[in-house]
Curated annotation (Swiss-Prot):
It comes from the Eukaryota. Its cofactor is Mg(2+); Mn(2+). The record marks 139, 212 as: Critical for catalysis. The modification Phosphoserine is found at residue 389. NCBIfam families: nadp_idh_euk, PRK08299.1. NADP(+) binds at residues 75-77, 82, 260, 310-315, 328. One of its GO terms (biological process) is tricarboxylic acid cycle. Keywords: Acetylation, Cytoplasm, Glyoxylate bypass, Magnesium, Manganese, Metal-binding, NADP, Oxidoreductase, Phosphoprotein, Tricarboxylic acid cycle. It catalyses: D-threo-isocitrate + NADP(+) = 2-oxoglutarate + CO2 + NADPH. This is Isocitrate dehydrogenase [NADP] cytoplasmic. Acetylation at Lys-374 dramatically reduces catalytic activity.
Amino acid sequence: MSKKIHGGSVVEMQGDEMTRIIWELIKEKLILPYVELDLHSYDLGIENRDATNDQVTKDAAEAIKKYNVGVKCATITPDEKRVEEFKLKQMWKSPNGTIRNILGGTVFREAIICKNIPRLVTGWVKPIIIGRHAYGDQYRATDFVVPGPGKVEITFTPKDGSQKVTYLVHSFEEGGGVAMGMYNQDKSIEDFAHSSFQMALSKGWPLYLSTKNTILKKYDGRFKDIFQEIYDKQYKSQFEAQKIWYEHRLIDDMVAQAMKSEGGFIWACKNYDGDVQSDSVAQGYGSLGMMTSVLICPDGKTVEAEAAHGTVTRHYRMHQKGQETSTNPIASIFAWSRGLAHRARLDNNTELSFFAKALEEVCIETIEAGFMTKDLAACIKGLPNVQRSDYLNTFEFMDKLGENLKAKLAQAKL
């Protein structure tokens, strides 16, 4: 490869701790030597978020809206300890949540699979991509303890002043209990549906929506109906052209089906189900260090990619003391590759598309050739049995990936 590939506009968000160090290494060794990017950089490190009163996070989200592609490093979401550690002005919200609220869209998690890394669910040979509808339901519910006997009712008061409607939830006759009122909005469910259909089309895999509409006939039934209506009107012919399909499944049936399957599908989950199943599926594949997270907006055009893990604080503390670390960079590299692949699709850029694919192949081929970080060696041998010769440290592994990428691209006729 003799010349740099022209890559176009990408919004890049720097993060915190060990992942911030890895992020810079990825740019320096794997991206910028080969791709000429119009980079719009935003420092989402906790100190800068504090200094800008979190305005930098909002600015980054607006930039993603404008340029359609964002790649994000893992960031600290502060708790009380972090507020004290960094002497923060306040406990700033999760940057991921802020960005998601501005962009809308659905977060899809996907495992990165290597043949030599054992999976807890051995039958999963292809990824299962989980899309979580991260809005409403239990997460925006009003719940309370019922102090004693009495009635719990839900009332809807129309804005136009017409007749109120009241429903009896439960009559507490002996003692109290607990009660909850939760909601969702058609617009949010519609956006969730569009993002899910767009994801299925981009991967060329079937899509399943899981609900419990047999019990929550009106509530979950609404999800089922909206998905079906949008599919029939706007996506059915595109799905059939790709020989893929959309189906609604009951959540219990879907969980059992997923366990028996070989993977290779998109699973659209309601908020709580997605929260639970995404972690369950991640563990089934073996490692959160090998899990990507992509936010897809309903327009199918705007995408933000990141690793599904945190900032690897424990390794950062070791690094600060000058101790050796072996931190897995793969999910962070895939944030870049997925972002660049999307940029390539938008711009019809075959060279950039080839590069993004080559970068992912190099990561998998390097691990399958036996060069890996300590966490992956532990997946294979069990942590107590891992010796120093079984793995590379953070910087050695990045160098190895850099060397292998250089060799792969040298063979390519670009």
